Amino acid sequence: MDAEAVDWQPFDDLRAYMQQAWPRVFAAGEVELIDHSLLVTLAGIDPALKPVMLMGHMDVVPVVPGTEADWTHAPFSGHVDDTYIWGRGAVDMKDQVAGILEAVEYALAHGWQHERTLLLAFGQDEETTQCGAGAIGRVLEERGVELEYLIDEGDYRIVEAAEYGAGEGWLMHADLAEKGYADIVLRTKSEGGHSSNPYGGTSLEVLSRAIVAICDIEWPARVTDLLAAQLVELGLYTADEIAASKDAIVRDCLASKKLYPLVTTTCAPTQIEGGSTGANVMPQDMWANINFRMLEGTSVADVVARCREAVAGGDLAGRVEVELGPGSSEPSPSPRIGGPGLEAVRSIAARYFRDPKGTEENGSPAVGQEPIGIVPSTVIGATDAANYQRICPECIRFSAFVVDDDECDRGVHGTNERITRRAYLQGIRFLIALLQTL
């Protein structure tokens, strides 16, 4: 993303609105603009304690041009009715940004005293390059800041345990790690010509064979410590069973759509460009993109090296260029499991989240329901939290702003993005309770 080509005025307007809507937060905190991202520091009573960070991102994905009329309410109107808050970013993730500020504003208005320093970090470009969170992370690292834990966006759903073969009950994810990210760009060159003489193969053929060769690479598959903790939490295995049967568990996970990305590096061809203009015309230069999500233990350099090796021999030798695309990131290091941040999330979630179909109208769990299980896991996407891994042993990706079934089906980046007012308020209640633990 070309930062100079971005219109930053909407971000300036958003920050001005934040200061107007949540004045106590910005009066009490030290406010810093880092690049176009925001860092607010609310000093605690005991400076010896490591700070906690609550974070989110201010940017949103675009609305597909031409679909604006398909929205029930204008996509950037922020329309609120009796049931829903509508608009792009209602779920991803203005709800968490606004909810954090609302919770802190409420706490300050009610005389909140906190031992630990609280950092609020709001990035500018999570949906693209993550430069904003990266800039904040570097500033904090240069200052020698070490966090106790942080909470970033996570899975927005409460899911049935049966989805994982775990019997009855309901679950929420607390993702403690994320996979690495790498885009591999393949390029082939050709003079083209008439399709009646494809001597040596067309550039499309060469590129296709290169894609297949790379997709056929076998990557190591294993049970990470975090996956082992997840399987134990789900009740699928005991710790002793995992230690004795890791190979069998890997095979089971590789056969499961839900679990296979958690045991190995994945490879997905996503883009191809440069076909010819006619059915009887051979294409000239072409390129393709293959997206990798790396399991802990496989580095960006490993991916580049193995892809180059896959196309280095035979008829492909010298005919395919392999480049690393922008925006790569290494997998999370092995995280702290069962730390104070996760325990706080577990304890508070047990008070505020139960069976989503049986919650009382005031947002509290219905009497007699079992609490939601909080499952430590790995997120297979990418988040801003990765930019803080060097200064934080417990990066928790967890959302207290739960979407309803319709929103799950539609997708958070789709038309008519929305969150219920009740879910938004429940997320704020969760955060207020979390603030009381600092």
Question: How would you label these PLM feature ranges?
Answer:
Residues 1-90, 97, 107-116:
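Acidic/His- and Gly-rich active-site-bordering loop/insert found
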Residues 31, 39-41, 47, 158-160, ...:
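An extended, acidic, His-containing surface patch that forms the Zn2+-binding/catalytic region
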Residues 42, 188, 292-294:
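Hydrophobic beta-strand positions in extracellular immunoglobulin-like domains
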Residues 73, 115, 145-146, 167-169, ...:
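Short, solvent-exposed loop/turn segments at the edges of secondary structure
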Residues 81-92, 372-375, 415:
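Short pre-catalytic strand/loop immediately N-terminal to key active-site residues, enriched for Gly-Thr
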Residues 84-87, 91-173:
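Acidic/histidine-rich catalytic neighborhood of metal-dependent amide-processing enzymes
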Residues 134-139, 191, 196-221:
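A short core secondary-structure module
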Residues 166-170, 187-194:
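Flexible glycine/proline-enriched surface loops and loop-helix/loop-strand junctions
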